[in-house]
Every structure is written in structure tokens, then in C-alpha cells.
Amino acid sequence: MSESLRIIFAGTPDFAARHLDALLSSGHNVVGVFTQPDRPAGRGKKLMPSPVKVLAEEKGLPVFQPVSLRPQENQQLVADLQADVMVVVAYGLILPKAVLEMPRLGCINVHGSLLPRWRGAAPIQRSLWAGDAETGVTIMQMDVGLDTGDMLYKLSCPITAEDTSGTLYDKLAELGPQGLITTLKQLADGTAKPEVQDKTLVTYAEKLSKEEARIDWSLSAAQLERCIRAFNPWPMSWLEIERQPVKVWKASVIDTATNAAPGTILEANKQGIQVATGDGILNLLSLQPAGKKAMSAQDLLNSRREWFVPGNRLA
């Protein structure tokens, strides 16, 4: 029975905490929890524990918060727990080879894509950004490479035209624990069937940046609409008006050709703010000026119509 496995859990954000909660709710034997050190947060910069630490302490589990797992004394913390397997979900620290080899069944990771597509830091966002029809989670055996280990289990889900990174995150946070629990049972039973990743299908999910999220009107309307969903809730697509950043929460594509230069405002009315792009027209529907709440294009036009005069160009 998989419940008899001695499991170390390593993770940090809410996504990881949901996996730990699922393990505990299904009766698995978690013998120790590793998570990142408390970080300053909020205006007061008060030290705040990670969601994983909060849950682990609520459940009375031993918690370890090393800054790194490279020092010998920190690796000994792992060794002393005599785990059968280490489950790693968005931990945020590199596991050295020595640590990867400590548990009897090695270390397994829950990754937010259908590997080998979107190895790396931002798989959820990049799947939206690229216009993928589906994504999912992969449970893999960890090795020293970046998401290069053998795949143990996959679950997929469709990406809808309304999905943002936020909604997709929630979907994968439901799928991941299901896949993890199934994989642990297979490891315990000896029925797991590792599958080598096809190197010809590898793509990399590079980190996001605030600068990348600035709207580039030379791109197509379809690409920009995907970017707006991919970068929501972070870093949020934005444009600059009168030296102020204005976030864009929602937009749609108008499939009409235009000869206007990219960035040219074509219309500004209750249907939205229509802007020419490198290919097609992007209709801005929901925006957020600096220091304000998100609002409809109509509400923004009521107070800032001078920002969106047809014929003017957005930078």
C-alpha cells in the first residue's frame, strides 16, 4: 500500500500546499516538510511563512527551511528522515545529486505542463501565450537536469478561449494531486512505467518579466489577446499613457483588416477601445489605470476620453 511509504514533501506556494493537503487527506505518511525560509511581505515587510509551512505546522509535521541544500549538514536533514520518496512541488531550491539519490525511490516532481513541452519556470503562462489547445501536469522522476527526468504519469486538460494563467493554475492544482496520488501508488506497487522524454519535442518556458508584458502593437491581435490572458494575474499586460502604466485585464480580437499603423486608435465607444495591431484589431475591454481599480473601457472613457482619441497612436 502506498500509505506505508515514508514521504518527504518539499514545496513552497499555495500550488504546493494543495498537493500536501491531498497527501495528508488521503492518509499518506509524510515524515517531514521542506519549504523556503520565511520572506518579508506586505507594506510592513513582516516575515511571512509559506503556505506549505502554515499547513505543515497546522498538521503538526516537522518543518525544515534551509536556504540551500548544498551544505552537508542540510543534506543530512534529508538523510535522517529515511524517506522512501521525496515529493517536490514548486519548492524553489535546486536539489543536488546527493539529495536526489537519498530516498529509496528517488525524488518525484509535479510539473505544470505536458512534458517535454514547456520545461522550465513558467509552463502555465507559456502554454497560453503560445495558443496551445491543451496542457496538463506531468509527474516525473527527478534527475540533475531542468525537468529532464523520465515521465511517470500525465493528466491533460483543455485550454479554453477564456482561460487566464489564474484559472489554468486552479485547474492544474486540482489535477496535480490526482496524478501524484496515483503515481505514489504505482511506485509503491512496483507498477510505475517510466517514459523517456522525446528530445525532439522539447520547448522551454522562459521566466516572465514586466517588460515582456508591455503591449507591443506590432504583434498580431490574436497574439496580444493571448498575452493578456497569459500574463494575468502576473505580471499583467500594460501600456503607457502620459507616462502612466495602464494594465489591460481583458481584450478581444476583431477580425477586420486595417491599413492603420500598429497602435493607432480606431474607435473608442461603449463596445471597447479598438486599436490597430500588426495583424488585425485588438478591442480593449477592461483596463486599470495606476492607483485605480480595474474598470470597463466605457467607464475609463467616461473619465479619460482624451487618452483614446481616434487617430492617435498608443506607444
UniProtKB/Swiss-Prot annotation:
Binding site for (6S)-5,6,7,8-tetrahydrofolate: 113-116
Assigned keywords, A-Z: Protein biosynthesis, Transferase
Listed EC numbers: 2.1.2.9
Classification via Gene3D superfamilies: Formyl transferase, C-terminal domain, Formyl transferase, N-terminal domain
GO terms, molecular function: methionyl-tRNA formyltransferase activity
Class of this enzyme: transferase
CDD domains: FMT_core_Met-tRNA-FMT_N, Met_tRNA_FMT_C
GO cellular component: cytosol
InterPro entries: Fmt (IPR005794), Formyl_trans_C (IPR005793), Formyl_trans_C_sf (IPR037022), Formyl_transf_N (IPR002376), Formyl_transf_N_sf (IPR036477), Formyl_transferase-like_C_sf (IPR011034), GART_AS (IPR001555), Met-tRNA-FMT_C (IPR044135)
Any Pfam family hit: Formyl_trans_N
Job of this protein: Attaches a formyl group to the free amino group of methionyl-tRNA(fMet). The formyl group appears to play a dual role in the initiator identity of N-formylmethionyl-tRNA by promoting its recognition by IF2 and preventing the misappropriation of this tRNA by the elongation apparatus.
Alphabetized NCBIfam families for the sequence: fmt
Full protein name: Methionyl-tRNA formyltransferase
Organism whose genome encodes this protein: Shigella boydii serotype 18 (strain CDC 3083-94 / BS512)
Upper lineage: Bacteria, Pseudomonadati, Pseudomonadota, Gammaproteobacteria, Enterobacterales
Gene from which the chain derives: fmt
